[in-house]
Amino acid sequence: MHIRFTKMQGAGNDFVVLDETQGRLGLTPAQYRFLADRHFGVGADQILTVRPSPGAGIDFEYVIHNADGGQVEQCGNGARCFARYVRDKGLTAQDTIRVQTMAGVIAPHLTADGRVTVDMGRPELEPARVPFDTTGLAPVSQGSGQKWPLALDGQASEATLLVAVVSMGNPHAVQLVDDVDTAPVAQTGPLIESHPRFPQRVNAGYLQIVNRGEVRLRVYERGAGETLACGTGACAAVVAGIRLGLLDARVQVHTRGGLLTIDWAGGLQDPVFMTGPATTVFEGEIDIPDAL
């Protein structure tokens, strides 16, 4: 199969974007994995697909596949690239669009300075809805938030972490660290991601508080490993920090790929807003093997 694609990145989180507004490509999980492969394919953290409106009041459908070929609910950095793509390709003339995802409707807005702000919707803090299994666990309360003990099997020390659990349409476990540069992301990230208390697996966030308006963050993403940035991870980390009484309503999030701005008023019904860059890297064509 011969297809056209666009390579994009948002704060270093990189994507292959596919246009299915004129018809479905019908790719298999193995073909998505091929596209994401950095040696044999194009290379990307996720594959983003643009599909036509699925219903009234919606402009587009936004479909996300991780590098492992699995479909996921949400990707914040990808949402910014999605909005930039449909505008640059002439698929819309609107500055604000309404986009259907597996997790619900989001509303990216292209700002005058070239960045994109995305209304990421309301965070979910009820553990069962993240989902996170709290059976037999007692939370540690801090501020208006909670941290939950998470025992990591297979660690020499049988370490127990304290994590705040948040869903931004996809599940996140956020832990506070003194220094993200020395955090054991490669060692504990896979253990947290596949921990049995997270039945849908989880994105593991490592959050360093610099001050009440500035943090540093690394994320080991479910199905992708550590990425240079994770938009929903930044949202979840800031929500956790605000609930724990550590952060103000606007926070600058330094990722390894760039800077994101997260705004949240702090109420359970308040949406989280994420602002950051979205850049086209190159356009291309590729032959995808039919049998993989």
Swiss-Prot record:
A Gene Ontology term for the protein's cellular component: cytosol
Gene Ontology terms describing biological process: lysine biosynthetic process via diaminopimelate
Record flagged with keyword Plastid: no
Record's subcellular location: Cytoplasm
Gene3D superfamilies found in the cross-reference section: Diaminopimelate Epimerase, Chain A, domain 1 (3.10.310.10)
Documented EC number(s): 5.1.1.7
Annotated SUPFAM superfamilies: Diaminopimelate epimerase-like
Keywords in alphabetical order: Amino-acid biosynthesis, Cytoplasm, Isomerase, Lysine biosynthesis
Keyword Isomerase: yes
Binding-site residues, substrate: N13, Q46, N66, G76, N77, N170, N203, E221, R222, G231, T232
Subunit structure: Homodimer.
HAMAP family assigned: DAP_epimerase
Protein name per its UniProtKB record: Diaminopimelate epimerase
Gene name of the record: dapF
